[in-house]
Amino acid sequence: MDNSRDKIHILGAVSDTFQEVQHPCSILKYKVYFVTTDTFYCKYLTASFTGLKKFPTERQLPLECHFNHIDWDLGNNFKVKEGVFYTFDIIAPLPRCTPRTIVTQEGSISYKLTVKLYTEDDCRMPKSANVPVVVPFTLNPDRIPESQHIRYGAPLNDACFTSLSMKSSKYSFLTAFFKYPQQCYKGPGCVCPLLIDLESEDADVLSSTPGSAGTDDPHIDPIAINSQDSQFIFQDRLPRLSNDCDMKGRSSLSRTSSPVVEKKLKRYYIRVLLVQSITFFLFNDAFRNSITVLFEDGKWSPPIVPGLHSRVEFTIPVNDLIHGSCTENPHLLVRHSIYVSIHSREPSSLSRKLAPPFLRTHKAKSNSLFSMKRPSSSSSSLSGSWHGDTENSVKQSLASPSEASLPNLSKYSRKNAKKLNEWLDSLDFKLPIYLFHRKLESELSHLPPYSPYRDSYFYLEDDDGDADTPSTASLDYFSNISPPDFLNKA
C-alpha cells in the first residue's frame, strides 16, 4: 500500500454481495486515506460517485450526460495533524439501473469516484483526487431481455487491464511484467487473458556450458548468438586446411568455435495456476479454508535478449462451474488468485505431485483435493463432479437429497491440504483476480449446504467425527442471512 504523504489515496473496487439472495446487488467499496506534512483545519471532506455517458454526434465534441450521483460527507470541521494516518470508508450499494462499463463506437459508459478537500489554510495537500471505477456487470433486469439467464461482464479493453511488475525471488535479475483483467466475467466461453513479459537486468544472461542454456527440454533448441561470427570462423579456417593436416585443422576448428556456439540465450519455463480459496466462517470466531487448483498450464518463454521483453501469453478458461468471488456473505468467503512460477526446466505436473492417487491418472487441467463418489463412474475433480456439466444438472442433483448428502464426499486428507498450502506459498508470484457470475441468486446453489452443526466442506478434517451424520440445513438457510451492519447504515 502506498503511504506517500501529501496525497489523497483511493483504493477499492466494485464487488458483488449476497445482501439478498433473490435480488442482485453490487457494492461500491473504496477506502480513502492520507498522511500530511502540515497541520491545517479542514472545513469539509466529501466524495462523489458519478456516471458519464458519451454519444458521438455530427459535431466535433460528443454529447455527454451525467447520471447515478452518490455523495458522501466524510468529515466536517476537523483539524488535520501532521504525520497522523487518516482513513475514511466509502461504501454504498449501486442502484438497480446502473449499467456496466462499456466502450464502443456508438458511445461509452464510464464512472469515476472523486474526493474533495476544502481548507482555507496553506498546505501541500491537493484539493481533489479522482479514480476511474469499473462496473463489471449490469443490474437492470427490466431493461435487458432474458436478463435472468445472463448478465454480460466488462469488455476486455485496455481500461479493464491491470499492469503489475514484480521481481523474481528465485532469479533476482529477472523482472516480470503482468497484464491481465483483474475483474473478469465467468461463464460459457469466458476466458482471462494473461500477458507475461520477462526482462533481464543482468547482462550475463548467456550460458557457456552445454545443457545449461536455460532449458533442459531436448525438443527445444536454444538460439545460438554470434552466428555470423561462427560462420566467419568457418570461412576463414577452411581455405587454410590441407589434406595433410585435415584432422588437425578440424580439431583446431572445433576448439576455436565451441566457446562461441555453446553460448545460448536463456529460456525459462513459466507455469500458471488458477487457484480458488473458499473460507467458511464458523462459530466462536473459528474458520476453515479450502484451496482448489482450477487450472494449470505452462509454456517456455522465447529467448531473453538483454534490454528486450520476452512475452508469454496464457488464456485461462473461466467456466460457469467456478464459484464467483464473494466477500460480503457473513459465513462464506470466496477468493481467486493466479499463481505464477518461473523454472529453468519443465517441472512435473501438480496433479501427479499433490493430487490423490485416483486423480493422478486424469489428464484434466482442473484438479481438486475434494471429489465426489459416483456409483456409475470413477471419481473426478470437484469442479467436474459436484457441479455437473451444466447448470441444469446442478439443480437436478441438488434437488435429490440422497445425491447432495454429505456422506457422498470422499475422504479428505489434511496432509494433502497442508502440502498444497506450503507449495503455493513457495511460488514466485501471486496475482489477485475477481470473478463475477451470471446470477447472484444461483451462486449459493453451487456450494454444498451449510450447517451450524456440520461444516459440509471441512467436517472431513475431523477424523474422529461421524461422517454419516447428514446435514439438516437447506439452501433456503442463506436467504435468511441478515446483511452486514454497514449495508444497513448505507
Curated annotation (Swiss-Prot):
Subcellular location: Cytoplasm; Nucleus
One cellular component (GO) term of this entry: nucleus
Keywords tagged on the record: Cytoplasm, Nucleus
Predominant localisation class: cytoplasm
Compositional bias annotation for Polar residues: 391-406
Residues covered by region (Disordered): 370-406
UniProt biased composition (Low complexity): 370-385
Protein name as annotated: Uncharacterized protein C895.08c
Source species: Schizosaccharomyces pombe (strain 972 / ATCC 24843)
